């Protein structure tokens, strides 16, 4: 049975557009860490579809799911004005050569996908080759979404803080670190020039502990690429709130399906310095 929500009235942000949106986009993680049945997808779209802009089949999960399910899920998404994107899988197809990649693009088009994501870090190909793949996707009639990850040199991570993958910014910054960020942005700019529609940024290491770390890196990425052309993966609720508090409702975010409602509450409310999550008080389930 679908869930229905009655929302409190927030002060609307006049700049936030209706779907289809070019900014303030919310892309939802599909099957990956957990299985999303058609019934669950239907409930999400019926109850919160107006807040969901995109659905992504993460981690190449679309290669393991029956094509009949994929087609039905994509059709369901399209009925609610939701675009559908592939996840990290195109780079695996490239191991079989350029012809296999062309076949992959055509298969994605036949299944109904709107966007193909290219993980630039996993591809490990020359920049010109990456740009050629972007053009192949565009020539196939689909949207191209290159993904870049902000990485750090291990030598830049203090040994005492390496436990559990935590990261503390070293002082002073190394020149290699700065060059890597500039290189990432330059590659992303060239992808946009080649026709890419959106640049996905995996910046967990930068902003997972953002209150004490490198918010300036995110600002540099947005400043160079533009807020409309960038999308950030927000892996948890605190990170979602961090982005909205600093960049407002128009920042594009990729989140888990469980964060959709909380994210929309945050987008629809003006936030102060002492803002706390409004999820517990922003809606009623009945």
Curated annotation (Swiss-Prot):
Induction conditions: Accumulates after heat shock (HS). Enhanced translation during recovery after heat treatment mediated by CLPB1 in a positive feedback loop.
Q: Read off the Pfam families from this record.
A: ComA
Note whether Protein biosynthesis occurs among the keywords.
Answer: no
Per its database record, what is this protein's job?
Transactivator required, together with HSP101, for long-term acquired thermotolerance (LAT) maintenance, probably by regulating heat-inducible genes expression, thus being a cellular component of thermomemory.
Keywords carried by this UniProt record: Stress response
Task: Supply the name of the protein.
Answer: Protein HEAT-STRESS-ASSOCIATED 32
What is reported when this gene is inactivated?
Answer: Normal growth and development under nonstress conditions. Compromised acquired thermotolerance following a long recovery period (> 24 h) after acclimation heat shock (HS) treatment, but normal when challenged within a short recovery period. Reduced expression of several highly heat-inducible genes. Slight increased in sensitivity to HS without acclimation. Faster degradation of HSP101.
User: What's a BP term from Gene Ontology annotated to this protein?
Assistant: post-transcriptional regulation of gene expression
Entry's family note: Belongs to the phosphosulfolactate synthase family.
